[in-house]
Curated annotation (Swiss-Prot):
Protein role: Methyltransferase required for the conversion of demethylmenaquinol (DMKH2) to menaquinol (MKH2) and the conversion of 2-polyprenyl-6-methoxy-1,4-benzoquinol (DDMQH2) to 2-polyprenyl-3-methyl-6-methoxy-1,4-benzoquinol (DMQH2).
Encoding gene, per UniProt annotation: ubiE
Xref: PANTHER family: 2-METHOXY-6-POLYPRENYL-1,4-BENZOQUINOL METHYLASE, MITOCHONDRIAL, METHYLTRANSFERASE
Keywords tagged on the record: Menaquinone biosynthesis, Methyltransferase, S-adenosyl-L-methionine, Transferase, Ubiquinone biosynthesis
Highest classification ranks of the organism: Bacteria, Pseudomonadati, Pseudomonadota, Gammaproteobacteria, Enterobacterales
PROSITE patterns: SAM_MT_UBIE (PS51608), UBIE_1 (PS01183), UBIE_2 (PS01184)
Claim: Ligase is one of the keywords in the record: no
Pathway in which the depicted protein is active: Quinol/quinone metabolism; menaquinone biosynthesis; menaquinol from 1,4-dihydroxy-2-naphthoate: step 2/2; Cofactor biosynthesis; ubiquinone biosynthesis
Domain of life: Bacteria
Species: Salmonella arizonae (strain ATCC BAA-731 / CDC346-86 / RSK2980)
Protein's name in the database: Ubiquinone/menaquinone biosynthesis C-methyltransferase UbiE
Length: 251
């Protein structure tokens, strides 16, 4: 129950007090962490790997640079960036959820990604890094879970170096109406059943579907990034807008 005096936000389709959302999202990801990679492959039929590959290709990351993989989870992007920046560069895998961070650290160490990767538990709304630290920041399927997205975007802008870029990979609004209806049917009816069968957790995947619906559409997120200070903001619709990659620069 939310008191009238409390500031509210959404948790999926629920209206909750702002201070409650972070804990509720944390519960979701504590629950799904061990099955996160398996569920990503099942939910997207493996296409998430292509979306992430495109993000890497658009990042412009070079040897010797410093990269922040925010809401980096199990480290798919970090693994690629680690090879790209080489021994003279650095990648920080940051996530607010310690269960996801532990899964990412274990996974990357098991495949030999060590030496130039650091792990930091961090809230996107108040990043614990100095101004002008990173050449590139990515946040992949994480922004929709943030309570105050505008505050998080301003925090990302602050820690980017001049000339740096932010890439936001996130579920978005399909641009083809028949696909939009089919996507809703899949998200709200099939996805929770897959979550129940594979992860024994239908509720977390019901939240996933609801959080996608509540996330700002392509043009709204573009304006939010511009309002946070980013310039030359553009976006790419992937899989007909099921996912969008937004990119903006700090000059």
């Amino acid at each position: 129950m939310v008191e009238d005096s409390q500031e509210t936000t959404h948790f999926g389709f629920q209206t909750v007090a702002k201070e409650q959302k972070a804990d509720m999202v944390a519960h979701v990801f504590h629950s799904v962490a061990s099955k996160y990679d398996v569920m990503n492959d099942l939910m997207s039929f493996g296409i998430h790997r292509l979306w992430k590959r495109f993000t890497i290709d658009c990042s412009g990351v070079r040897r010797g640079q410093t990269v922040l993989d925010l809401a980096g989870g199990t480290g798919d992007l970090t693994a690629k960036f680690s090879r790209m920046v080489g021994e003279t560069g650095k990648v920080i895998l940051a996530d607010i959820n310690d269960s996801m961070l532990k899964m990412g650290r274990e996974k990357l160490r098991n495949i030999g990604v060590i030496g130039n990767v650091e792990y930091v538990q961090a809230n996107a709304e108040a990043l614990p890094f100095p101004d002008n630290t990173f050449d590139c920041i990515t946040i992949s399927f994480g922004l929709r879970n943030v309570t105050e997205k505008e505050k998080a975007l301003r925090s990302m802008f602050r820690v980017l170096k001049p000339g740096g870029r932010l890439l936001v990979l996130e579920f978005s609004k399909p641009i083809i109406e028949p696909l939009s209806k089919a996507y809703d049917a899949y998200s709200f009816h099939i996805l929770p059943r897959i979550g129940l069968m594979v992860a024994n957790d239908a509720d977390s995947y019901r939240y996933l579907a609801e959080s996608i619906r509540m996330h700002p559409d392509q043009d709204t997120l573009k304006v939010m990034m511009q309002d946070a200070g980013f310039e030359s903001v553009d976006y790419y619709n992937l899989t007909a807008g099921v996912v969008a990659l937004h990119r903006g620069y700090k000059f």
